[in-house]
Amino acid sequence: MKRRQFIQAGAGVSLGLAAQLAAWAQEAGVGHESATPGDHPSPTGAAQEGAQPAAAPSGVMPSGPMSKGPDDQHEAMKRVVKSIYAPTRYVFVADRFSNFISVTDIVSGEHVETLNFSMRPHVMELARDDAMLAVGSPEVSAIEFMNLRTRERRRVELPSPVFQIFFVPQTNLVAVGLRDQVGMISYKDFTVRIFPRRFDSDQRQTLINTYYSLLFSSFSQSFWVLDEDRPCIYHRYGGAEPLDAPWKTIDLSRHIGSGSGLGIGVASPEDDLLAMTTDDGSEGLLYFPAQDKVLSTGPMRTVGSTNEPMIMPYIDAYSKHVIFADVTGNVAMFDLVNGNGKPERFRVNFSPRFVRTGWLESTWILAGDKGIMFQSFKDPSDRKIVRFVPEVMNMWVTGDSKTALYTLDEGAPAIYRFDIRTREQLPPIRVRGVTMASMLRMGSNNSICY
């Protein structure tokens, strides 16, 4: 989006790789510290996730005595290089002010590694069923892949920068949204299929934004493009369809009173449901493609004008609830199972930025500027609000649905945590290697939509 906030960062180069390799060689065979008992993953399972051998980066020699031949050198490097694939333990934290991504173990609290892809990590995603990391930046016309087991990296050149990345479950495919095009990349053979149709605007004044938002249904491999200038959705399938396959236009103008174009949104894994905002922030919309049916939140913003006043909508893991909110504190929630098509309205006394759910979808979470709220789906009065001074930069819920992780824009870089079951705060985990902890990603999550 043209008003999308980008992670601001400076360039930097990772140093001390040889020293790291030497230290790893001395520690060969030593695993992570045992996880503490309780609800965390078992130490045995975590060790299996995080200790798989892999090939060393090209051109890096192991420290210690010289090997006798290439095969011996290769085996020595395999023993030295450690996998950083542990989807239930490792959190990848992007720095707001540099190129660095810190890898932190949320079980032991240890710093695992700092990664540098020589680009600002505005876009960072991990596969949920594979050991693959993808990183992009609005300033680089390329995407970087890293196999977290083997540590192999591959940069794939693209026609324009990447703004959105979606891993396709049970495949080696990634859907991407570029500056004005969308397409798919295979990280098995790194082939690129970019669809020829462009989604741009006559109003473009800079190259570091888009004038559309891509929603992607991961199971059906559906591309849903929201037009920022017009109240239209453009739809097509990826997969084996020809590059020049036609796009279907879905006109929502009769459903939007303000006549605004479309803003941001999220799609269910199949072609059942889209949740989106209008670009002017006046309302949120639910679109059901099979019935060509639209539900509206009604007016959201009350007075004034703000920059992207509505935040990203949220569809829970079971597609039962859809939640909309704006930065002024207005919240609208649809119950698609027991509701009557009308949203339940709420008002909070802080400025929301993120919506999430947890503890097996019994609780929804609203986090933002100076506050975080936990509320039961069944009982709206069962609510807890925690107030603080900083703003929440990003939020993630662990795959077991029990822990909310978030970062703040003040203080030392850290991963802050809440136990969603008790709604009590857990001790923060210090994040090394970054100036300000911002975006959070893990290889596991409690919602397929995210």
Predicted regions and their residues:
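N-terminal export signals
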Residues: 5-25
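Predominantly soluble domains enriched in secretory-pathway, periplasmic, or organellar proteins
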Residues: 10, 26-450
